[in-house]
Design a protein with these regions (language model features):
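N-terminal accessory segment detector
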Residues: 1-91, 100-118, 123, 132-147, ...
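A helicase ATPase "motif cassette" and its flanking acidic/Ser/Thr-rich regulatory loops
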Residues: 94
């Protein structure tokens, strides 16, 4: 599945998870359904990060540099428009100015869980990829802001 753009993977996942979430909400309540989805997505993102680290890391590069090299996959097909503010072996700062993931979830009537399906993955993916990488993000387009602020740091 490496050759499938990530935005297509997320659409396919959302087509399944949307109805599952609706049923969980009906039977368990919205809050419990969100908790279950949050934990499931977090675990999937950590596992995905571990897989990417095992298959896409170059020896001799910093963990964050390996991560930066992968970032193109999330942007594939115009999925994200970004302004890179700083890029180094221990810091990667950028703003997302257009997010087709957010647009896609809105079009699918899943905007209410889009943050769980995509945004929540970003920081937890790092835990699996290399736990020295951390993300600080103060705002997201999915949350109503004009841009998403990504501030990655890596302990060396």
């Amino acid at each position: 599945m490496d050759n499938i753009p990530i935005i297509i993977k997320r659409r396919l996942q959302a087509e399944v998870m949307g109805p599952v979430f609706d049923e969980m909400s009906a039977q368990l309540g919205q809050e419990k359904a969100e908790d279950i989805l949050r934990v499931a997505i977090q675990n999937a993102a950590i596992a995905e990060g571990q897989n990417f680290a095992a298959t896409h890391s170059s020896p001799g590069q910093s963990p964050l540099r390996n991560f930066i090299d992968l970032f193109e996959q999330w942007k594939a097909g115009g999925a994200l428009e970004v302004d890179v503010l700083h890029e180094s072996d221990d810091q990667f700062d950028f703003n997302v100015t257009r997010c087709r993931y957010a647009e896609m979830y809105q079009e699918m009537d899943l905007g209410h869980i889009g943050h769980l399906l995509s945004c929540h993955r970003d920081g937890t993916f790092c835990q699996g990829f290399d736990d020295r990488i951390t993300l600080q993000r103060d705002q997201t387009i999915m949350g109503g802001a004009s841009c998403c602020t990504f501030r990655y740091r890596c302990e060396t």
